[in-house]
Amino acid sequence: MDFKYDVIVIGAGHAGCEAAAAAANLGSKTCLITMDMNKVAQMSCNPAVGGIAKGQIVREIDALGGYMGLVTDQTAIQFRILNRSKGPAMWSPRAQCDRNKFIWAWREILENIPNLHIWQDTVKEIIVENGEVVGLKTFWDVTCLLYTSDAADER
């Protein structure tokens, strides 16, 4: 396996999953590093997506081609409109999701994106040369390097 990437994303929370998917979908050779493949995009003890603030962010992610809204639709167990006692400007959709199905739906999406490698490990060191990040080392002594502008012809 080639351990040189255009983009390396550390952490497979919601933002890390969206970032890795976006980079890979734009054609970048991408590596997503997570400590636990069974906790990709894990939701908190309140597995809600939506509400006034997060609902706006989810709509923006959706407009940019992201996956959080799609995964929410696939794994929701309850949909509700919040703040109905207030005016329409304050109404906000929210979904409660099945936490385990949410993880598996995200994994299925990520594992089927071309250019995206998912690596289970812990990052122990960021490699910096001349003030620039050039890669990282993991707990299992795997080295992942970033392509540099000088090495663009190597691909």
Where are these regions (language model features)?
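Beta1/beta-strand and adjacent pyrophosphate-binding region of the FAD-binding site
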Residues: 3-13
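Conserved N-terminal/central alpha/beta ligand/cofactor-binding core
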Residues: 4, 21-132, 140
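Residue-level detector of intrinsically disordered, flexible termini
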Residues: 11, 96, 150-151
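N-terminal Rossmann-fold NAD(P) dinucleotide-binding loop
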Residues: 16
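Core beta-strand elements of the Rossmann-like FAD/NAD(P) dinucleotide-binding domain
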Residues: 142-146
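Single conserved hydrophobic/aromatic residue that forms the stacking wall/gate
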Residues: 147, 151-155
